[in-house]
Structures are given as structure tokens and as C-alpha cells.
A protein has these predicted regions:
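N-terminal glycine-rich anion-binding loop in soluble enzyme alpha/beta folds
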Residues: 1-65, 136-174
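Short active-site oxyanion
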Residues: 14-18, 107, 127, 188
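Gly/Ser/Thr-rich loops at beta-strand to alpha-helix junctions
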Residues: 20-25, 82-91, 116, 133-138
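Short, well-structured alpha-helical segments in soluble
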Residues: 60-73, 176-188
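Glycine/small-residue-rich loop that forms an oxyanion/phosphate-binding "nest" at active or ligand-binding sites
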Residues: 67-114
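Periplasmic-binding protein-like
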Residues: 76-81, 129-131, 187-190
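Conserved beta-alpha
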Residues: 97-165
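Active-site glycine-rich loop that binds ribose-phosphate moieties when present
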Residues: 111-115, 170-181
Length: 190
């Protein structure tokens, strides 16, 4: 007779939880493509951009609920994967939401804002050329966040894409050319 004790459990090395905007169609295929075979990504969608846009304090309950559900998947870490949302209301608001995500999920929590600043710290980059997909009003919030974290923006431009449909379909060559036009010899990162 078959017994569960006769079999080794199938347990991945890590489970990564991502809370992404409902409109985002890029993160899932990209993360799945780049994850090693023994690392499993899990995704939860939340209305946090476009018609759902609101201050982070108003989105906190939605985000925290999705973090709680990802916790049911036994994720090792949960990430709020939305740069504009995580930077938009400053580091204090971002910190509050990240703490709530950790409590709700029972896992370590991060945001893309924190991931960006951690990556820049790892390469000791403080002088940046910064380009985002955002219209000026939202781009300026990201600029404030970065400057508030001690970064010098040598050049900065919001490309003004009209929404997620464009963000999800704009080819990488567009971004390469946009960055090439803003080249700065003093830049430590782009």
C-alpha cells in the first residue's frame, strides 16, 4: 500500500511572492523566465494603478490582503512590485506598508523602491540619470523619493507614456535610445 512517508517532499529552494498592479502584463513572464528551476514565483494582483491609483495609505489594505494570501503559499519573501506606488508617497509611507506586508504574510517584505535603492547602494552609485515611463506629475514623486534617499539626479525625464498598455508594449530599444540621449559622463548609474 502506498504511503506518503515513502516519498521525498517536493520543496523548492525558495518561493517568491509578488504583488503586482492588476494591469501589469510584464512581470509574470519576465520573473518566470529568469528564476532558477528551484525558485518558484507566486503572483497576486491588486488594483493599485491607473483607475485604481490612490495614495499608498489608501492602498495599504488592498496590498496587505494580497500579502496575507501570498503568505498562505509559504513564500519566503513578498515584494510590492510597483515602483511608482512604492515611491510615490515617500519612504515613511513605503516603510509602513512594507512592515504591514511582513506582518500579514509572515515573510520578509520588500518594495521595488527598496530594491532599487539597495541595488544602487551595492554598486555605490549616487549620481544618477533617471528615466521613467511616467507622466511628469508621477515622475516628480519618484524624483522626490530618490533625492530624499540621497541620490543626485544629473538628468531626469518622465517619458509620459499614457498608461500601462504602453508600459507593457514599449520595446526595449525605445528605452535604450532614451537613455543614450541622456548620457552623462558623471553618471554612476542609469
Amino acid at each position: 500500500m502506498v504511503s506518503i512517508s515513502d516519498f521525498e517532499p517536493v520543496i523548492p529552494r525558495a518561493r517568491l511572492g509578488f504583488i503586482i498592479p492588476a494591469s501589469n502584463r510584464m512581470v509574470e513572464p519576465q520573473v518566470q523566465h529568469f528564476c532558477p528551476d528551484d525558485v518558484v514565483p507566486h503572483f497576486a494582483r491588486a488594483g493599485i494603478t491607473n483607475r485604481h491609483s490612490a495614495p499608498l495609505s489608501e492602498l495599504k489594505q488592498r496590498i496587505t490582503y494580497q500579502a496575507e494570501l501570498l503568505g498562505d503559499s509559504k513564500v519566503n519573501v513578498v515584494v510590492l512590485q510597483c515602483t511608482g506606488t512604492s515611491m510615490g508617497d515617500g519612504p515613511e509611507a513605503e516603510e509602513e506598508v512594507v512592515k504591514a506586508m511582513a506582518e500579514a504574510s509572515g515573510a520578509e517584505a520588500l518594495s521595488t523602491a527598496r530594491c532599487v535603492t539597495s541595488a544602487l547602494a551595492a554598486i555605490r552609485a549616487k549620481k544618477l540619470v533617471f528615466v521613467s515611463e511616467s507622466k511628469e506629475v508621477d515622475h516628480s514623486k519618484k524624483e522626490r523619493y530618490l533625492r530624499g534617499q540621497g541620490y543626485q539626479l544629473l538628468k531626469s525625464k518622465g517619458m509620459g507614456l499614457p498608461g500601462s498598455d504602453y508600459s507593457c508594449t514599449t520595446p526595449s530599444d525605445y528605452w535604450f535610445q532614451a537613455m543614450a540621449e541622456m548620457r552623462d559622463p558623471e553618471a554612476e548609474a542609469y
